[in-house]
Swiss-Prot record:
Keyword Disulfide bond: yes
GO molecular function annotation: disaccharide binding; hydro-lyase activity; maltose binding; protein homodimerization activity; zinc ion binding
Regulation (activators, inhibitors): Loss of hemagglutinating activity by EDTA treatment. The activity is fully recovered by the addition of 5 mM Ca(2+) ions, but not with Mg(2+) and Mn 2(+). Hemagglutination activity is inhibited by maltose and its derivatives, with maltopentaose and maltohexaose being the best inhibitors followed by maltose and iso maltose. Not inhibited by glycoproteins.
Disulphide bridges, residue numbers: C53-C213
Protein name as annotated: Dioscorin DB3L
Superkingdom per UniProt: Eukaryota
Gene Ontology BP annotations: one-carbon metabolic process
Modification(s) after translation: Not glycosylated.
Similarity annotation: Belongs to the alpha-class carbonic anhydrase family.
Length: 272
């Protein structure tokens, strides 16, 4: 283990108790602590509306293994048309959420327009690439006019600060250090999250990763990793309930699903 990795682990663990002090007792309806009465393995029994969490056939997250994907160039380049929009930042106790109040743009899948509605943060990452879990996952939740849902996930490893989170730090601090659970974040630009040119990506059918674990969600997981600083991840952890400091749902079985993979088109001066 490198000295840099040891430092990052020390930084996070040394401030763990400050995370606990910000617990919100009214947000303990479910927990991410495995083995607890309201932990992930019991979500499906906590509420009749959450039964899919326990008996669903297309649950997320999953391990995305390159040796099990179907290479599908016909998926085409990721088509997005995002734009800056007014938003709030909300702490629901389980995660931090950017909630757009005006049109933040869209993603297009199979000629269907999915409008960006909100953005969630999970640490560590929920999805795993070839058995490796990363330090943060950002999930961009979209909805079509006929109420179909699609989520685009970007995974991050420790490194340089993420510019999108940098712009939100003051607002994260506000909802972490006060009784407020939602603040006006002004204008937020989601284009900062997807600054990759023609990224390779995985596509599969899954579910939301928190109760009620609704299925029939089209997932797009970007293969290229972003970077985030340990301090930024720590800010997210400090803001949430003590039961959600590590708010990543355990991996779910793939079962009979197919994972499709769009391989980025290489150029003479570029590579995946």
């Amino acid at each position: 283990m490198s000295s840099s990795t040891l430092f990052h682990l020390f930084l996070l663990s040394s401030l763990l108790f400050s995370c606990l002090s910000n617990a919100r007792p009214d947000e303990d309806d479910f927990s991410y602590i495995e083995g607890s009465p309201n932990g992930p393995e019991n979500w499906g029994n906590l509420n009749p509306e959450w039964k899919t969490c326990g008996n669903g056939m297309e649950q997320s997250p999953i391990n995305l293994c390159d040796d099990r994907v179907i290479q599908t160039p016909a998926l085409g380049k990721l088509r997005t048309s995002y734009q800056a929009a007014r938003a709030t930042l909300k702490n629901n106790g389980h995660d931090i959420m950017v909630n757009f109040k005006s049109d933040a743009g869209s993603q297009f899948i199979n000629q269907v327009r999915y409008q960006l509605k909100r953005i969630h943060f999970h640490s560590p990452s929920e999805h795993v690439l070839n058995g490796e879990r990363f330090d943060l996952e950002v999930q961009m939740v979209h909805e079509s006019q006929d109420q179909r849902r699609a989520v685009t996930a970007i995974l991050f490893r420790f490194g340089r600060s993420d510019p999108f989170l940098s712009d939100l730090e003051d607002f994260i601090s506000q909802i972490s250090k006060s009784e407020k659970n939602e603040v006006d974040a002004g204008v937020v630009d989601p284009r900062q999250l997807l600054q990759f040119d023609d990224p390779a990506y995985y596509r599969y059918m899954g579910s939301f990763t928190a109760p009620p674990c609704t299925e029939d969600i089209t997932w797009t997981v970007i293969k290229k990793l972003g970077t985030v600083s340990p301090r930024q991840v720590l800010m997210l952890k400090q803001a949430v309930n003590e039961n959600a400091i590590n708010n990543a749902r355990p991996l779910q079985p793939l079962k009979f699903r197919t994972i499709f993979f769009y391989p980025r088109q290489k150029s003479n001066h570029d590579a995946i």
